[in-house]
């Protein structure tokens, strides 16, 4: 899956070309991916030199603070949850968006 921003940009371009995503959606998504990548780098720096156990605990705490990735993506990009879910599924060629969507409170 396209975790590196460079790979992601190519991927987003393809989705726009295929008419699956608008240029604006791709742009917002790219900005979000760059933000996430930078944050991840920061996390990795923060846990440097920690024991495996402490590292796991730290990452778990961070995930809890950040909450549902789909909700964060939607909020940061100004998408509806439904649209964010569709875009996430497209980008991951899977139902990752759908599975996060199932975990959002307003659903079910």
Describe the function of each predicted region:
Residues 1-108:
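Mature extracytoplasmic/periplasmic regions of secreted or cell-envelope proteins
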């Amino acid at each position: 899956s396209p975790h590196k921003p460079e790979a992601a940009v190519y991927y987003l371009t393809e989705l726009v070309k295929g008419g699956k995503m608008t240029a604006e959606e791709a742009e917002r998504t790219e900005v979000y991916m760059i933000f996430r990548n930078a944050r991840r780098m920061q996390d990795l720096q923060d846990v440097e030199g920690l024991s495996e156990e402490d590292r796991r605990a730290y990452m778990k705490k961070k995930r809890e603070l950040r909450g549902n990735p789909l909700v964060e993506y939607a909020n940061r990009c100004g998408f509806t949850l439904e649209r964010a879910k569709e875009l996430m599924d497209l980008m991951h060629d899977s139902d990752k968006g759908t599975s996060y969507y199932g975990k959002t409170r307003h659903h079910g």
